[in-house]
Every structure is written in C-alpha cells, then in structure tokens.
Amino acid sequence: MTVAPGLKKAAVLCVLRHADAFLLLQRLKPPHQGLFTPVGGKLDPYESPQQAAFREVQEETGLQPLEMVWRGMLVETSPVDYNWISFVFEAHIERVPPPACSEGTLVWVEKAELAVVPTPLTDHFIYEYLLANRPFQFDATYDATLRPLVMREELQGLSLPLIS
C-alpha cells in the first residue's frame, strides 16, 4: 500500500521482555539500520494495532505471546518521508534462545545494557517509561536529515532531553 509523502504510516513496536531482559532486533535495513529496536512493522489493511502486534511478533520471531499489552504511542514527524504513528505494546515471554530473523539479528539485552547498546533516541524513553510502568504519548520531531529537534511526552506536557 502506498502512502502519500508526508502522511503518517501506522505501525506497531513490540517490546518483548523476560524479567529485566529485552529481546531486541539489530536491524539489517533502514530505518535504524544497525541499531537495536523492538520488533514491529506496519499495520495491514483492516488490522487492529493489537492484531498487528501479534502478527509482527510471530512473523519476525516465530514466538506467540499469550498477551500483548498496549503501553503507549510514539508519533514521529519530519519534513521527509519519515512520518509514523506507532502503537507500542509489551509482551512478557519465556527466555528462549534468540530465533533466526530475516529482518536482522535478535539478541537478549539486559536492562543494564540498554543505555549502551545503539538504539534510536526515542527508544531510551520507551524503555524508561515501560520499566516505570507509566503510559506515554511521545511526540518526536526531526529535521530533513532525521536529526531529532524536539521530543515531548504529551500526557504530562514534558519536554524530554535530547541526548544522542
């Protein structure tokens, strides 16, 4: 499905956890090539965000979580073709050996390592809020080179520090 330039694309981010460990994807392709991210992807036509979350986890990991809990939203805006509305879900899973994935390499990352593994700037805030069990509505604005300009948490009206 083609989306007109500048329109937001709907997607899901699926944070897979076992206690304080996160199963993250080191991405092979843009966006965020080489960075560690939750699994996820675009919503298919007529699909709810939760249905997309279950489907994306199954497609990218082969895993089938029993429950997928909505945790927040991430809206990303830029003057180029990088405009997303992402529904962020969390699933608690067994700590299994990382399965093969065509999108990149799946790796278990411990909570203490989250600050040092390369991730998109927005993801640090997602993990912080998840670990504190706080819902969120993040709004990130980028320039034409996709350098972050502004990051806000809209539920509390907070400007968040941009440290890259």
Question: For each of these PLM feature ranges, what is it?
Answer:
Residues 130-151:
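Short, active-site-adjacent segments that bind or coordinate small-molecule cofactors and metal centers
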